[in-house]
Amino acid sequence: MSLSDIQQAILSLITNHINADGVSPSQTEIARAFGFKGVRAVQHHLDVLEQQGMIRRVPGQARGIRLKHLTQVDEAALALQSEDVLRLPVLGRVAAGQPIGADIGEDRVVLLDRVFFSPAPDYLLRVQGDSMRDEGIFDGDLIGVHRTHDAHSGQIVVARIDDEITVKLLKISKDRIRLLPRNPDFAPIEVRSDQDFAIEGLYCGLLRPNR
């Protein structure tokens, strides 16, 4: 059973609302957005979305709609998503603290509206630690990463030092490279000349999962 155009539109509305506000829209808000006279039509479409494995609903909660992992979503439905929606893989974890080893990935895909990021990211990483707290990046956030090996001093980057990955503020001077935390509880990282160092990408925005 495939989704109708209105069901695909409702799914996009739910996705964008959760990404923007951290919670799902209420059934009344969905009804208002689509011009329905009441919530009965919304309930029918939500029933279909739940049967198709797109969402699950938490009983007794007005904003209890939850998105399922998109690895469970029909590829045909994904192909019909708007060009304004990015389909981004979550590739693993990145340290906002001491650098951590590269992660093999979470086997997960997230749909996000393009407007949340600049430039457009190529993938997402889950933040571990709070060394970037004062930049508004917290433990558990998903950060968008634009894949590039070029960066300027003052940009927030995802960097690799030997086999470890971290997200920090890049500072380049004539004779040294430093990766600065945005939390006074953490010390800067001085990149030594004998270390294998590379910029893996630029930070370009974040998604804060509903906790």
From Swiss-Prot:
Record carries keyword Lipid metabolism: no
Entry's EC annotation: 3.4.21.88
Record bears the keyword Transcription: yes
Record PANTHER family: LEXA REPRESSOR, LEXA REPRESSOR-RELATED
Subunit relationships: Homodimer.
HAMAP family: LexA (MF_00015)
Function, as annotated: Represses a number of genes involved in the response to DNA damage (SOS response), including recA and lexA. In the presence of single-stranded DNA, RecA interacts with LexA causing an autocatalytic cleavage which disrupts the DNA-binding part of LexA, leading to derepression of the SOS regulon and eventually DNA repair.
Protein name: LexA repressor
Source species of the chain: Xylella fastidiosa (strain M12)
Lineage start: Bacteria, Pseudomonadati, Pseudomonadota, Gammaproteobacteria, Lysobacterales
